[in-house]
Regions:
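Short beta-strand-centered aromatic/proline hotspots
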Residues: 21-39
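Intrinsically disordered, low-complexity, charged/polar segments
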Residues: 42-95
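Short, charged/polar surface micro-motifs in flexible loops or helix N-caps
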Residues: 17, 41-42
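Short, charged beta-turn/beta-strand-edge "cap" motif at the junction between a beta-strand
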Residues: 1-2, 13-20
Length: 95
């Protein structure tokens, strides 16, 4: 995919597995992320995600260590043209 590079800012749509059980209503919200690795040429990437969790009222949830987290890492994330939970997309450009 053209434009894929480490350091690019993209959008990540929060998946319900990123959230605590009582916060599933936040699935699909879009947050900022940075590409930290390009996994393949077909647009699969690893991301560091940056939720505005203190203002949005939710915390990301790590299944391995069940505690609130700030930034979080997502591996092997697929691209979506439009925001879709668990996938990344390019930020829209203003015209």
């Amino acid at each position: 995919m053209e434009g894929l590079a480490i350091g690019r800012i993209v959008h990540y749509s929060i998946h319900e597995s990123d959230l605590k059980p009582d916060q599933k209503q936040h699935a699909g919200e879009v947050i900022a992320a940075i590409i930290v690795a390009v996994v393949d040429d077909d647009s699969m990437v690893n991301l560091t995600c940056f939720p505005d969790w203190s203002n949005n009222g939710f915390f990301t949830y790590n299944q391995a260590t069940p505690q609130p987290l700030g930034m979080f890492w997502k591996t092997s994330v697929k691209h979506s043209q439009d925001p879709e939970p668990g996938k990344w997309s390019w930020p829209p450009r203003k015209k």
